[in-house]
Amino acid sequence: MALAKLYLVTGDQKYLDQAKFFLDQRGYTSRTDEYSQAHKPVVQQDEAVGHAVRAAYMYAGMADVAALTGDTAYIHAIDRIWDNIVGKKYYITGGIGATAAGEAFGKNYELPNMSAYCETCAAIGNVYVNYRLFLLHGESKYYDVLERTLYNGLISGVSLDGGGFFYPNPLESMGQHQRQPWFG
């Protein structure tokens, strides 16, 4: 995302090329794991996997590169990933990232209530992804997801008085989940 912004500010193609290069290395390095979304090349990815925050930021970067280059392989890949998230890995509250183990996306339709992780930071990343996809496609469905995430999955992470913070945002609690003091 930062390199795409730097390209937009400076007009220097090397920044956009560098952003695409970093993304294109996924699936081709010695580290080829799902946790870091490096299990296969980004243009072949079709499922949200691994660490949810890292994934969301990478998907936002993919949307930036897709929009700025017009690369149809990138556009199709990010569309497939978005369909997977919204259709199979998205909570009614707008949360993403079902499991505390690895702070990660779970399997398709793995959406527990009591142990839902739904990290606040993943919700922020999901807002970024949907904003960029709206700019890319101009379809309201992206803003529908953005708004649900913003008003239910993101804002819920902060207490009404601003003094407490939820790192994870489970859907169900029997009193065991408490907001932590603000990290500041």
Segments (PLM) and residue ranges:
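Glycan-recognition and catalytic cores of secretory/periplasmic carbohydrate-active enzymes
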Residues: M1-G184
